[in-house]
Every structure is written in structure tokens, then in C-alpha cells.
Swiss-Prot record:
Matches recorded under InterPro entries: 6-PGluconate_DH-like_C_sf, 6PGD_dom2, G3P_DH_NAD-dep, G3P_DH_NAD-dep_C, G3P_DH_NAD-dep_N, NAD(P)-bd_dom_sf
Record protein name field: Glycerol-3-phosphate dehydrogenase [NAD(P)+]
Record's catalysed reaction(s): sn-glycerol 3-phosphate + NAD(+) = dihydroxyacetone phosphate + NADH + H(+); sn-glycerol 3-phosphate + NADP(+) = dihydroxyacetone phosphate + NADPH + H(+)
SUPFAM superfamilies for the chain: 6-phosphogluconate dehydrogenase C-terminal domain-like, NAD(P)-binding Rossmann-fold domains
Function: Catalyzes the reduction of the glycolytic intermediate dihydroxyacetone phosphate (DHAP) to sn-glycerol 3-phosphate (G3P), the key precursor for phospholipid synthesis.
Annotated residues for binding of sn-glycerol 3-phosphate: K107, G135, S137, K190, D243, S253, R254, N255
Pfam families reported in the protein's UniProt record: NAD_Gly3P_dh_C (PF07479), NAD_Gly3P_dh_N (PF01210)
Active site: K190
Amino acid sequence: MGSLNSIAVLGGGAWGTALAQTAARAGRKVTLWEHDAGNAEHLIAARESRFLPGVRLEPSIQVTRDLAEAARADALLLVVPAQVLRQVVTSLQPLIAPRTPLVACAKGIEHGTHRFMTEIIAEAAPAAIPAILSGPSFAADVARGLPTAVTIAATDAACAQALAQAMNSGSFRPYHSTDVRGVELGGATKNVLAIAAGIVEGRQLGASALAAMTTRGFVELVRFGKAYGARIETMHGLSGLGDLTMCCSTPQSRNFSFGMALGRGEGIESAAHGKLAEGYYTAPVLLEMAQAKDIDMPISTAVAAVLGGKLSVDAAIEGLLTRPLKAEE
């Protein structure tokens, strides 16, 4: 695959804007597509995102509401919520050239179908090359040019390398991989585990409990990954252990802060602060997929039960602490 000189970013929220900034700093021609008229007008007039106040858009970034214009780019970064990805890709499908890389930048699993992000892309745009970008990265850090490393994966090795090269800037370092399943699985699973870690923090159960929750959560991530075909080295890498460690340690993570609010006794609507964390949607799907392969995932199961109103936070914690003793894996 040749050089990817133009990049379109679909989604003008915090993460989309941050990735557009990165691509521009890497020397790419960047188009930032935003479907919401108000947000698009603000981006154009103020040259900054409402979600990243104080961060000026790079001068070379062009903002548009025209999907056809964005679709002409050499590669497209799809920075939209996991549950609307299929709708966006379906709209894109007739507009893109064959073998255009479509890079999912959301971390989740589709409700009802149990499809991962690249599977949705493959189904909705069969002529495209599906890819995934994931890893320990907060939008505010990336937008401000702070050092960040992520993984970009595609089954087409040349495509993965070209995407990594296209997004590489002085502070944003992408590693490339062909383990698509491992990369997207790590990001989706950690969303749920970060809620559990946040509950521990919100309940003020202490640093020891938080370390135990994070470590045993990683065991669940590895179990799930092995069962669904991920490579062990990917799960120990940026998109697995790296992302989990970050999101289980700071309220900058929406899933962690959501869990903290639940741990303090807030209801789900109050804890969401107007926008539910992706882990809320992933938890029941993750549980169904774990049950389908008889994977033991007690922490994820407890989170799903709390979010589904089947267990209180205290009952979930007690259930985990009273499980039969076993050898450490």
C-alpha cells in the first residue's frame, strides 16, 4: 500500500478532534467531519472543539458536514460511538474507493450481533480495509501533544504499517499489528473492568483492593481474549494491559469515573452525567459472549449485574470476596 497523504476523521468530539490534530501534525491533509450542525459551526468559527476548550485546531484542518467530501480521503478514522458505527459505515459504503482503510476508533461490541468493530466495517463496506486504533490514550493528552503510544491493527500488514506511518508524529507513536481481534477485544473488555475499578475507588476500599481488582480484571481479559482468538502478546501490550492500567487508575477515564459515582451510591442516570460510558453498553454483551464459551469472568459478571439492577454494589462486592478460594492463574 502506498502513502496515505490525506486523512478524514469522522466525529468532531474530543477524541475525533484530538486524532485530527495528530494527523495534521504528522503532515497529512486532514478533513474533520462533524454531523451536528451546531458543533460543526463552532469548530469552523472558533477553531476549537467545545469538548477540548483551549486547544486550537491546527490551521491545515478543514471542517465539513459533507460526508462525500470526507470520503475522498486516502484513509478514514471512524470516531463515532460503537453502537452507531454500522449506520455511519453503511452511509459511507457507496462513497469510498475500493480498498480504502476504514479505521474504527471506538472500543465496544455491537448489541444484538456481538460483532466487533472491524466485523461491522467488513459487513457494511465489503470493499474497504477494516482496521482498529486502540491503546492507552486520553483525548486531552493527545490533543495537547503529550507523548502517547497506541496500536493500529489490520489483517492487511501493509495497510497497518501505512496507517502507523501516516499517524506518526513527534509525540504520537503508533505500533502496527495484524492481530485485529486482540486489539479491539482489549479495548472493549477494559471498559467494563474500568467500571469495576471505579466502584472500588468510589467505595473507598483502598489501594490494595484497587490493585487486586485491576490485576484480576486483567486475568479475565486474558481468558476472554484466548477464547476469542487474540494473541497473548497483544493482550500484554498497549491495547490490553496498557489501556486497562490507565483506565483503572484515573477519573479521566469515563468508565472509571462512572464506576466511582456508582461506588459513592449514585444511581446510573446520575452517575452518567448526561452521557453513559461505553462500558455500560458493553457489559451485557460481554457477559453473553463469555457465557457462550463458558468463560469464568466474575468481575465482569458482577458489573453487568449491578448495571442491570440485579445486584447492589455492596452485594456484588460481597459476592466477589466470598468466592471459593483457588490457585492463582
